[in-house]
Amino acid sequence: MITDGTETINSLAKPIKTALAGFNVQICSAEKFAGNDILSADIFFLGCENPSPASFAYLEEMLSHINFASRKCGVFSTSQKSLKYLSGILKDSEAALGETMLSTDGGYQQSDITKWVKELLK
């Protein structure tokens, strides 16, 4: 799971990790992200608070050159613009983008997140 490292997004990443119990899940800020962190993943998640964070530059570049066809990806944010941005940077990678998760108030229900994750895993 790659995030922009903001407190709000990291607070959403933690219950996603909880919903993925039984999987080897790592939460990594985009600043510390290395390409090989995502290459072996069967499913990955991206989250940012605002569109085009500077820390996502390397990730954007990588996603434009590597094919993730049939690998599932979930994106989450607190803004529609950020969800659109995240969906856009995945386009060239051909990752199987699931339904996006929007938390406009920064809050969440673990049951809703678990349901969202289970849908992505189908």
Question: What is the predicted role of each segment?
Answer:
Residues 1-4, 77-79:
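Short beta-strand/turn micro-motifs composed of small residues
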Residues 7:
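Short, surface-exposed ligand-recognition loops at beta-strand->loop->(often short) alpha-helix junctions
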Residues 10, 15-30, 35-122:
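FMN-binding flavodoxin-like domain, especially the glycine-rich phosphate-binding loop
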